[in-house]
Amino acid sequence: MKIGFIGTGHITKSVIHGILGSKLKIRRIIVSKRNNKISSSLKRKSKKILVLNNNQKIINNSNWIFLSVTPEVGHKILPELKFKKNQTIISFISTIKMKDLKKYTNMKSKIFRAIPLPPISIRKGPIPLYPPNKSVKKFFDHLGTTVEIQNENLSLNFWSTSSMMAPFYELLNTLSIWLYQKGISKSDAQKYITSLFIALSEDAKINSKNDLKSLVQNSQTPKGLNEQAVNELRKSGFYKSLNKTTNSILKRLKK
């Protein structure tokens, strides 16, 4: 199978790295020359990579097409492109809905929306997919944990929570800087904080079939440090601000 990517940003790079490290049998991966730095690094990584300077040529030479541009660019370029009737189109574009994708591509079927995140490069993390499809799910199962969604409105909730990626990294950065300012070396501070949150996340995943509230309760002792920390953050409105922000993101997606 030959696959092509319209857009050569960080997500495209992450997805391709995941593909190259997986057991997927892909004969050719075609990318745009638009981001020369990323496309050149990808070409050096594998002989399967072909770099073209024309989006239409990418479409013409691919069985599956992945749309990985910003919404602004998508609205501009998609109506100008001609897709093949037998092509599978998978959009990573956050705010272009299915009705517009169908209009822009002049396709009524074989169009999907997926939400890959950068950890897909190491074949980790959830990949929400709408609508459900056996072949597309099988593809993404090689790259992470596919979560099939039954309707587009529900998928917007996953887009909203995926926006917590940068805030999560900012949390790690803030705590690492705090340790550094207390005299810990930068490398040790970052190693400690990232290792801590990896361990906490893995523990949460193992226990994800249970109510996550139990993890909150079990990580505290009466008058202990964790009890103090979670109570102070609650009083400051830290957790309520998460709900407020995800609601704000959801409102934007529904426009």
Predicted segments — roles?
Residues V15-H17, I38, I49-L129, N133:
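Rossmann-like NAD(P)(H) cofactor-binding subdomain of soluble oxidoreductases
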Residues T194, I198-K255:
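NAD(P)-dependent Rossmann-like dehydrogenase/reductase catalytic/cofactor-binding core
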Residues D100-K110, G125-W159, S163-N207, S248-L253:
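Internal alpha-helical scaffold of NAD(P)-dependent oxidoreductase catalytic cores
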Residues I29, I58, G74, S185-I193, ...:
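Small-residue helix-packing motif on alpha-helices
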Residues T12, S39, S62, G74, ...:
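A general structural signal for well-ordered alpha-helical segments in protein cores
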Residues K13, H17-G21, R44, P79, ...:
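Short, well-ordered alpha-helices that flank and scaffold nucleotide-derived cofactor binding pockets
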Residues M1-N53, K57, W178-Q181:
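NAD(P)+-binding Rossmann beta1-loop-alpha1 motif at the extreme N-terminus of oxidoreductases
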